[in-house]
C-alpha cells in the first residue's frame, strides 16, 4: 500500500480537530485524541491503530507490541495517540527490526520524592499518653489484619441485610380484593383519554403475558389509568391484587398517586399510596403503591421474597433510561423466573422498542395514540426570520462581515510569514516596566481593580491603544518578541484593554499568538488572567488550533487539559451550519451565521426566550407557556428576569403566574402548577425535562424548547464526573413538542435549527453507560445472588457497561474499604449503600460523624456531589474578580474546600438577611446551586438519622456530632478519609506535584492554590511558585483530569503528613507494613534507593511504614510505631461505630478521639496552617461571622473597632497568609523568606501570629485579621499596653468545671465562648485594665480573679474539657483563694437589673464601682484562707 511519507501539517477544520482518523470512542476517548498533529498516514492504519489501542485500554493485558513493519511516521502516530490516551509507549531495536511497545501506567515509572513525617514533641506525648492508658488490644490488632479467608457469606449477608433495612423499603402486605371505585368529578375526563378505548384489550393482554410493553404518546393517560384498569378488573372478578408502580422521580410518584386517589374519590394512603425515600403515605389497605425506582430497588435488596406477595409491577417512563430503571429491569427479568404469578408492565412515551423486545424475548407491544390536536413547530431560523430578533452582537457581526474577509487574508499572510521577514508596522517605544512585580493586588485595596467597570469594548479604545496593542501582537507573532508581552500585560491592567483583545487586522488574540509561537508560560499567564480559550479568529481557529497547526505539542496539551475540565458539552452550532448548511436558504443561512456568531452555544439564550415570551404574551391568545430549560440555574435566572429585571413583565406581574418545576422542588408548588389560573392571567412554567413526561399540565398551548439538558457524565478511566450541558435526543424533542397540543392546537418554538435536529441522537445515552458505577456496584452486591460477581450481574443489563469500567469501580470500592477481596460488602459498605451520595463522599460523612465534625462535612460533601457553586463569568476581568472572591472565602487556609464551605455559610447569612440575590451576584455564586445543596443536606441528614448515626437527643445527637466542627484540622481529616486515594505529594526538590501514576500534576487554574501570590498578572512560572508556597507536602483533590501528559487537579486542600498517615490506606494493614531500621536497610528504600553514600547513612536509622503501593513513609522508628498504633486505635474505633452506630461511646472511644484531635491540631499548627473561625456553625440564622463582604476593604489608617474585626475575611486573604504562623512552619513558604516579610517578634505579651506588615510603598496594611489590635507603628514595636487614662472594666467568668480553672492558674491562659470574645477584646483595647472574676457553676464560691494580659487570639487550646470555647488569651492571676458567695450578698449589679453579683451569667460585666468593691472583699478573707500569688 502506498504511504505518503511527508509529515506536512494540514489545516485543521474550523473549530479545531486535526487527528484525521476517528477519535477513540468510549467514555475515556471522547475528544481527547484531537491533540494528534496531523501526521499523514493511511486512513485504514489510523482506524486499525485506534481500535487496537481502544481494546487494549479496556482489556486485561498490561502491554502490547506493534509489528516492526511500521514506518517511522506510523510509529510517531502511535506514540502520540498512546500519550493522549495516558499510555506509555517505547520504541526498541534498530532499522528494520525497530518495534514499538505500549504499556499501561502502573505507577512504577514515576520516581518519587521521599515521604517523611516529623512529629512535634506534643504529638508524641498525646499518642504516648493514649497508648499507655489504653494500649492496642490483641482483638483490635487481629481485626485489623488482612482477611485470609472468606467469612460465612450467608450469615453476614443476613445480619447486614437486617441491619440496613432501616429505611426506604416498601412494606410487606398481602394481596386483597380492591374496593369498588367511587364516582368522581374526573370520570368524564377519564373517559375522554385515548387509553380508555383500549381498556379491555390492555387488561386481556396483561392477563395472557408475563411481560407487556405499552407505548403511548405523552398525555394519553397511560400512567394514571393502566393501574386503575387492573384494580377495577380485580374488583369485578374478585381477584386479590397488589401493585407497585415505579416512577423515575419523587415528584412524579407523589403527583400521580394523589391524582389517582382523587379519581377514585379516596384519601391518599387508603387503596392508593406512595413511598419515596424518607417519606411515605401507605397503610395495610394499600394495594397500589407508587414509588421511585430507587425505593423498589432498595426493597429488592432485602431479598427476592419481597415480591412474593406482589401481583403486578409497572415500570413507567422506561425511555428515560436512568441507571435505576435499567438496573431494575435487570433484576426483574431474573425474578420473573422465580415468581410465576408476577406480571411486568413497561410503559413509556418514546421507546427504543426493539431493544426491549429483544431483552424480554418477543413480548407483545400495545400502541396508544395521543390526542389529535396539531402542533406547529418553529425552528431557530423560523423564529429569527418571523420575529425579527437581533441583538447588539448580530448587528456588529453584519457590519464586520466585510472586515472579516480582509482579516482572513491578513491571517493567511501571517501564517506563511517567516520570522523577521516583515517590517514591524511601527517601531514600538520600549516603555515597559517590570510589570509583574509592580501590580500587587494589595496595593489598591483589592476590589478597586474590578470596580472600574469591566474592560472596554474595542470600539471605546482610543486609536493609540489599538495601534499599540496591534503593534505588540504583530511583534510577538512576526518577530517572536517575547518581551512585547510585558507591554500587553501592562495595557491590559492600566488601560483596561480586554485580555481577549483582537488584533484589528487579523482578529488574533494574545492567547492565539502565544499558543502558535509556543510561549508556554505566557499561555498560562493569559489563562490565569481569564483569557477565553474558546475564542475564535476570523478563520474559525481557536488558540488550540493555532498550537496544533504550528506543532506546539506542549501547548496543545496545556490547552486541552484546561478545556477538558471546563465542563463544556459538544454544542457548537456554527460549525454545523458551515459544514452542512447547503440545504438552507441563503437568508436563513446568513441569519443563523449571524446569530451563532453572537451567542455562545454552551449557554441558553435567555434574551431570545424573553423576546419570544413577550411576543407570545402580546400577540397570541390565552394559554399556558411551558419553557424547557437545562437546569435550575437557568430556571432561576429566567424567573428573576420575568419577575424583577425585565420592565415589560415586571411592571405587570399580576398578569402572570410563574411556576418552577425541578426534581428537587417542594411538592406543594407542583400541585399549584396543575390548577387553572384565574381569568386574564397567563401561566408561565419554567421546567427541566421533568415536564417532558412525568408531569402533564393540561392547559399548555405554547412550548419553548431550549433543546438542552444537563447530563452527568463520567470518564471512567480518569474517575471524573462532570455535569455537562448537552443537546437533547430526537425522542425528547418530539416529547417536548407534544406537550403543546393537549387542549387545542399549539406551537412549539425550538431554539435550535432544523439541521441540529437532524443531527441529534435518536435516544438519550443510558445513564448506566455514563455514570460512575461505584454506587451501583454496592447496590448490585445487595441485589445479585450471593456468589455472583458484580461484573456478571451487570453484564445482564439491557445495554451493559464496559467490563473494564465495572472492574475499575469494584477496585475503587475495595480501595476505600467498602468491599473485601472477595467482593463481599464490609460493615462500611453496607452503610454506604444506604447513603444517597457516591461512596467516597458517604465515607467522608461517616468519618465526620465519628470525628464529631458533621456539619461542615455535610455542606462540603453535598457541594462535591452536586457541583461547584461558583459561576464562571465570561469576561476576563470578571474571571479575575471571581477568582479573588473564591480566594477571599478560603481565609488563607490553602483549601478550595474551605472556599466552598464559607461561601455556603455566607450565602445562608445573606439569605436570612434577605439579600441573597445581590450577594450571589457580588460573589459570583449560583443561587440555584446553593438551594439544591440545602435540599441535599437535609436529605442526607435525614438518612443519617434513619440509620441511627445521628440520634434525636443525648449522646450522638446533632450537637454531639458537631463537637469538633470548629476545628478545621479535624474537618480536613474527614475530607482526607473520604478523598483517599486522591492524593498528591509535593516534590520540593523539583518543585512538582506527583501522584501514584503521574510524574507531573498541575493545579487547575480554578483552584485557589494555583495562584497564592494574588498578583493581577500571574507570574510566569506560576505552577512552581504555587508549589513553593505550599505549607505542607501533601494535598487531597476532588478530581483529576488528564489530557495527554498533563494531569490537572481541582478542588484541593493542603493537609499534614500525619493526617495522611492515620486516615489513608486500607484499615487492614499487612503485619509487615512497619519495617524497623535493620530490616529496612537490607531491603533498601522502596523506589528511592539512592546512589549517594551519604543518603544511605541518613536513612539507615529510619523505619518505613508502607500504607499502600505508593504511600511509603520513611520516619524515625518511635514516630512510626506511635503512628501505627494511633492508626489502629482510629480504625478499630471506626469499625465499632460502623457495627453499632447508636451504641453509647465508651471511655476508650472518647480518649481515642481526644488524642486524635490533639495530634491533628498540633501538627496543623506546627505546619503554620491557619485555623479560620466560624466554620462549624450550623445552618441557622447566622452570627456576625458573616458581615456583608462590602466592608472587606477598609482604609489603612482607621483603627479597627472590635465590631469590625469579627469577620475573618476583613483583611485580604493574602495578608492572612502573610501572618506569622504560631510556630515555625515545616517549610516556611519561600516567597516570604525572600521578600523579608517575616518581622522580628513583638512584645512578649503579644501573640506571635501578628506581624507588622510594611508594603513596598510603605503604606501599612490593615492589621492581620487574627487580631483586632491596631496596626503597630514600626517594625518590632511592642504591643501597645492598655492606656492608663482609660477606665477599668470588670467581668464575671463562669466555668463549667474546676479543672479548667486549675489549668488556667498553671498556664496563665483562658478561653471564653465566641459570644463573649468580642466584648472582652473591645474592653481590652479601650480600657486600662480588664479584671476577670471566676466562679465555677454550682460551687457557691468565686474562685479568684485575674487581669487580662493579651487580646483573644484565633488559636484554640485542646486543654479545656468543655466544647464550644473560642481562642486562647493570656491572664495574670492575682488572687486564687475561694470567696464564698455570702461575703458578697450585699453587692447588687445595676448593669444586670440590680441582681446580686453572684447571679451573673458568663461574661456579665459589673458596674465599675461594684467590681472594685467585689475585688476588695478578698482583702477581708480570714488569714487562713489568704494565699496571695505575688
From Swiss-Prot:
Q: Which GO terms describe its biological process?
A: germline cell cycle switching, mitotic to meiotic cell cycle; meiotic cell cycle; oocyte development; positive regulation by host of viral genome replication; response to interleukin-1; response to tumor necrosis factor; spermatid development
Keywords, A to Z, come to: ANK repeat, ATP-binding, Cytoplasm, Differentiation, Helicase, Hydrolase, Meiosis, Nucleotide-binding, Oogenesis, Phosphoprotein, Repeat, RNA-binding, Spermatogenesis
- Give its E.C. classification number: 3.6.4.13
Q: Where is the YTH domain?
A: 1288-1418
Which regions are flagged for Low complexity bias?
1191-1200, 1250-1264
| Domain Helicase C-terminal residues, every copy | 612-784
State a GO cellular component annotated for this protein: ribonucleoprotein granule
**Name used for this protein in its record:** 3'-5' RNA helicase YTHDC2
Q: Which organism is it from?
A: Homo sapiens
Q: Which gene encodes it?
A: YTHDC2
Amino acid at each position: 500500500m502506498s504511504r505518503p511519507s511527508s509529515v506536512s501539517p494540514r489545516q485543521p477544520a474550523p473549530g479545531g480537530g486535526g487527528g484525521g482518523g476517528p477519535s477513540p470512542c468510549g467514555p475515556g476517548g471522547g475528544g481527547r485524541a484531537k491533540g494528534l498533529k496531523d501526521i499523514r498516514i493511511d486512513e485504514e492504519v489510523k482506524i486499525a491503530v485506534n481500535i487496537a489501542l481502544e481494546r487494549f485500554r479496556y482489556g486485561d493485558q498490561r502491554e502490547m507490541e506493534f509489528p516492526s513493519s511500521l514506518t517511522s511516521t506510523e510509529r510517531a502516530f502511535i506514540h502520540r495517540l498512546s500519550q493522549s490516551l495516558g499510555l506509555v509507549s517505547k520504541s526498541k531495536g534498530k532499522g528494520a527490526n525497530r518495534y514499538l511497545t505500549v504499556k499501561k501506567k502502573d505507577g512504577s515509572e514515576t520516581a518519587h520524592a521521599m515521604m517523611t513525617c516529623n512529629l512535634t514533641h506534643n504529638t508524641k506525648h498525646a499518642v504516648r499518653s493514649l497508648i499507655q492508658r489504653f494500649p492496642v488490644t490483641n482483638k483490635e490488632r487481629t481485626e485489623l489484619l488482612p482477611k485470609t479467608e472468606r467469612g460465612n457469606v450467608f450469615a453476614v449477608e443476613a445480619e447486614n441485610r437486617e441491619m440496613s433495612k432501616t429505611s426506604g423499603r416498601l412494606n410487606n402486605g398481602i394481596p386483597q380484593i380492591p374496593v369498588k371505585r367511587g364516582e368522581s368529578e374526573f370520570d368524564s375526563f377519564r373517559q375522554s383519554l385515548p387509553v380508555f378505548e383500549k381498556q379491555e384489550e390492555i387488561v386481556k393482554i396483561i392477563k395472557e403475558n408475563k411481560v407487556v410493553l405499552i407505548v403511548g404518546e405523552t398525555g394519553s393517560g397511560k400512567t394514571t389509568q393502566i393501574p386503575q384498569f387492573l384494580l377495577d378488573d380485580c374488583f369485578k372478578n374478585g381477584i386479590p391484587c397488589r401493585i407497585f408502580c415505579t416512577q423515575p422521580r419523587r415528584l412524579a410518584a407523589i403527583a400521580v398517586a394523589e391524582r389517582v386517589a382523587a379519581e377514585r374519590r379516596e384519601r391518599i394512603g387508603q387503596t392508593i399510596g406512595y413511598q419515596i425515600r424518607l417519606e411515605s403515605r401507605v397503610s395495610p389497605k394499600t394495594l397500589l403503591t407508587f414509588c421511585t425506582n430507587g425505593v423498589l430497588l432498595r426493597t429488592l435488596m432485602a431479598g427476592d421474597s419481597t415480591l412474593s406477595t406482589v401481583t403486578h409491577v409497572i415500570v413507567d417512563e422506561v425511555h428515560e433510561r436512568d441507571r435505576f430503571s435499567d438496573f431494575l429491569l435487570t433484576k426483574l427479568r431474573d425474578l420473573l423466573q422465580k415468581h410465576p404469578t408476577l406480571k411486568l408492565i413497561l410503559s413509556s412515551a418514546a421507546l427504543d422498542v426493539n431493544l426491549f423486545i429483544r431483552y424480554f424475548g418477543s413480548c407483545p407491544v400495545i400502541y396508544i395514540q395521543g390526542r389529535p390536536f396539531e402542533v406547529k413547530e418553529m425552528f431557530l431560523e423560523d423564529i429569527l426570520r418571523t420575529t425579527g430578533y437581533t441583538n447588539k452582537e448580530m448587528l456588529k457581526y453584519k457590519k464586520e462581515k466585510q472586515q472579516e474577509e480582509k482579516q482572513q487574508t491578513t491571517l493567511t499572510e501571517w501564517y506563511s510569514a517567516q520570522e523577521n521577514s516583515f517590517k514591524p508596522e511601527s517601531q514600538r517605544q520600549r516603555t515597559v516596566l517590570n510589570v509583574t512585580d509592580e501590580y500587587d493586588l494589595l496595593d489598591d485595596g483589592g476590589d478597586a481593580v474590578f470596580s472600574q467597570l469591566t474592560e472596554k469594548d474595542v470600539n471605546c479604545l482610543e486609536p493609540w491603544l489599538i495601534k499599540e496593542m496591534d503593534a505588540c501582537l504583530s511583534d510577538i507573532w512576526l518577530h517572536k518578541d517575547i518581551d512585547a508581552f510585558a507591554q500587553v500585560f501592562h495595557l491590559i491592567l492600566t488601560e483596561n484593554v480586554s485580555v481577549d483583545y483582537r488584533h484589528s487586522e487579523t482578529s488574533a488574540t494574545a492567547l492565539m499568538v502565544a499558543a502558535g509561537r509556543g510561549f508556554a508560560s505566557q499561555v498560562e499567564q493569559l489563562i490565569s488572567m481569564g483569557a477565553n480559550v474558546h475564542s475564535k479568529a476570523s478563520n474559525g481557529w481557536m488558540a488550540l488550533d493555532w498550537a496544533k497547526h504550528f506543532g506546539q505539542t506542549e501547548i496543545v496539551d496545556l490547552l486541552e487539559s484546561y478545556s477538558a475540565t471546563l465542563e463544556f458539552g459538544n454544542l457548537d452550532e456554527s460549525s454545523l451550519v458551515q459544514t452542512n448548511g447547503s440545504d438552507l436558504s441563503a437568508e436563513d443561512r446568513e441569519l443563523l451565521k449571524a446569530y451563532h456568531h453572537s451567542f455562545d452555544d454552551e449557554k441558553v439564550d435567555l434574551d431570545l426566550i424573553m423576546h419570544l415570551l413577550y411576543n407570545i404574551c402580546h400577540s397570541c391568545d390565552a394559554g399556558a407557556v411551558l419553557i424547557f430549560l437545562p437546569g435550575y440555574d437557568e430556571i432561576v435566572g429566567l424567573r428573576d428576569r420575568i419577575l424583577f429585571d425585565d420592565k415589560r413583565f415586571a411592571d405587570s406581574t399580576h398578569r402572570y403566574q410563574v411556576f418552577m418545576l425541578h426534581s428537587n422542588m417542594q411538592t406543594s408548588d407542583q400541585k399549584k402548577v396543575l390548577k387553572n389560573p384565574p381569568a386574564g392571567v397567563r401561566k408561565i412554567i419554567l421546567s427541566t425535562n421533568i415536564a417532558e413526561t412525568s408531569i402533564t399540565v393540561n392547559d399548555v398551548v405554547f412550548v419553548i424548547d431550549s433543546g438542552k439538558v444537563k447530563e452527568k457524565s463520567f470518564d471512567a478511566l480518569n474517575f471524573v464526573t462532570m455535569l455537562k450541558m448537552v443537546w437533547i435526543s430526537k425522542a425528547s424533542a418530539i416529547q417536548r413538542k407534544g406537550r403543546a397540543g393537549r387542549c387545542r392546537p399549539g406551537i412549539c418554538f425550538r431554539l435550535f435549527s432544523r439541521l441540529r435536529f437532524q443531527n441529534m441522537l435518536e435516544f438519550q445515552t443510558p445513564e448506566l453507560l455514563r455514570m460512575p458505577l461505584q454506587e451501583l456496584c454496592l447496590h448490585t452486591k445487595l441485589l445479585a445472588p450471593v456468589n455472583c460477581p458484580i461484573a456478571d450481574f451487570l453484564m445482564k443489563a439491557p445495554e451493559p457497561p464496559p467490563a473494564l469500567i465495572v472492574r475499575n469501580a469494584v477496585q475503587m470500592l475495595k480501595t476505600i474499604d467498602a468491599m473485601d477481596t472477595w467482593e463481599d460488602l464490609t460493615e462500611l459498605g453496607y452503610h454506604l449503600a444506604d447513603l444517597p451520595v457516591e461512596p467516597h463522599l458517604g465515607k467522608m460523612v461517616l468519618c465526620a460523624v465519628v470525628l464529631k465534625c458533621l456539619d461542615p462535612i455535610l455542606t462540603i460533601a453535598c457541594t462535591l456531589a452536586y457541583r461547584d457553586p461558583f459561576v464562571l463569568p465570561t469576561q476576563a476581568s470578571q474571571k479575575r474578580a471571581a477568582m479573588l472572591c473564591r480566594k477571599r472565602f478560603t481565609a488563607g487556609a490553602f483549601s478550595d474546600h474551605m472556599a466552598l464551605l464559607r461561601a455556603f455559610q455566607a450565602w445562608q447569612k445573606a439569605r436570612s438577611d434577605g439579600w441573597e440575590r445581590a450577594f450571589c451576584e457580588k460573589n459570583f455564586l449560583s443561587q440555584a446551586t446553593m438551594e439544591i445543596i440545602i435540599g441535599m443536606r437535609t436529605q442526607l441528614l435525614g438518612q443519617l438519622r434513619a440509620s441511627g448515626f445521628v440520634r434525636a437527643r443525648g449522646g450522638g445527637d446533632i450537637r454531639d456530632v458537631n463537637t469538633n466542627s470548629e476545628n478545621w484540622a479535624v474537618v480536613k481529616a474527614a475530607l482526607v478519609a473520604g478523598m483517599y486515594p486522591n492524593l498528591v505529594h509535593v516534590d520540593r526538590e523539583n518543585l512538582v506535584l506527583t501522584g501514584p501514576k503521574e510524574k507531573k500534576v498541575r493545579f487547575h487554574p480554578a483552584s485557589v492554590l494555583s495562584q497564592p501570590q494574588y498578583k493581577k498578572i500571574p507570574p510566569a512560572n506560576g505552577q512552581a511558585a504555587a508549589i513553593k508556597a505550599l505549607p505542607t507536602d501533601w494535598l487531597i483533590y476532588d478530581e483529576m483530569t488528564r489530557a495527554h501528559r498533563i494531569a490537572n487537579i481541582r478542588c484541593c486542600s493542603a493537609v499534614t503528613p500525619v493526617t495522611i498517615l492515620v486516615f489513608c490506606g486500607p484499615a487492614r494493614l499487612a503485619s509487615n507494613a512497619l519495617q524497623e531500621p535493620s530490616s529496612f536497610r537490607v531491603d533498601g528504600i522502596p523506589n528511592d534507593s539512592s546512589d549517594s553514600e551519604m543518603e544511605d547513612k541518613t536513612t539507615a536509622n529510619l523505619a518505613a511504614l508502607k500504607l499502600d503501593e505508593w504511600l511509603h513513609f520513611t520516619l524515625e522508628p518511635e514516630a512510626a510505631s506511635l503512628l501505627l498504633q494511633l492508626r489502629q486505635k482510629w480504625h478499630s474505633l471506626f469499625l465499632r461505630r460502623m457495627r453499632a452506630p447508636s451504641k453509647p461511646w465508651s471511655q476508650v472511644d472518647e480518649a481515642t478521639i481526644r488524642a486524635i484531635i490533639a495530634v491533628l491540631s498540633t501538627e496543623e499548627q506546627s505546619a503554620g496552617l491557619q485555623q479560620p473561625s466560624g466554620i462549624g456553625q450550623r445552618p441557622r440564622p447566622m452570627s456576625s461571622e458573616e458581615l456583608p463582604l462590602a466592608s472587606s476593604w477598609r482604609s489603612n489608617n482607621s483603627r479597627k473597632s472590635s465590631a469590625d474585626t469579627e469577620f475573618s475575611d476583613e483583611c485580604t486573604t493574602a495578608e492572612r497568609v502573610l501572618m506569622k504562623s504560631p510556630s515555625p512552619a515545616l517549610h516556611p513558604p519561600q516567597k516570604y523568606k525572600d521578600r523579608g516579610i517575616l518581622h522580628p517578634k513583638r512584645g512578649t505579651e503579644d501573640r506571635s501570629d501578628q506581624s507588622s506588615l510594611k508594603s513596598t510603598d510603605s503604606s501599612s496594611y490593615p492589621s492581620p485579621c487574627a487580631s483586632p489590635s491596631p496596626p503597630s507603628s514600626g517594625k518590632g514595636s511592642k504591643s501597645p499596653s492598655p492606656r492608663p487614662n482609660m477606665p477599668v472594666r470588670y467581668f464575671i467568668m463562669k466555668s463549667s468545671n474546676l479543672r479548667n480553672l486549675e489549668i488556667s492558674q498553671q498556664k496563665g491562659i483562658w478561653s471564653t465562648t465566641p459570644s463573649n470574645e468580642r466584648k472582652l477584646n473591645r474592653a481590652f483595647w479601650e480600657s486600662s485594665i480588664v479584671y476577670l472574676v471566676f466562679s465555677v457553676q454550682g460551687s457557691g464560691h468565686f474562685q479568684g480573679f485575674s487581669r487580662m494580659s493579651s487580646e483573644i487570639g484565633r488559636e484554640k487550646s485542646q486543654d479545656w474539657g468543655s466544647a464550644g470555647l473560642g481562642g486562647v488569651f493570656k491572664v495574670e492571676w492575682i488572687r486564687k483563694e475561694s470567696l464564698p458567695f455570702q461575703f458578697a450578698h450585699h453587692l447588687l449589679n445595676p448593669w444586670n437589673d440590680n441582681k446580686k453579683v453572684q447571679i451573673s451569667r458568663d461574661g456579665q460585666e459589673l458596674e465599675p464601682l461594684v467590681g472594685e468593691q467585689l475585688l476588695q472583699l478578698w482583702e477581708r478573707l480570714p488569714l487562713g484562707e489568704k494565699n496571695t500569688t505575688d
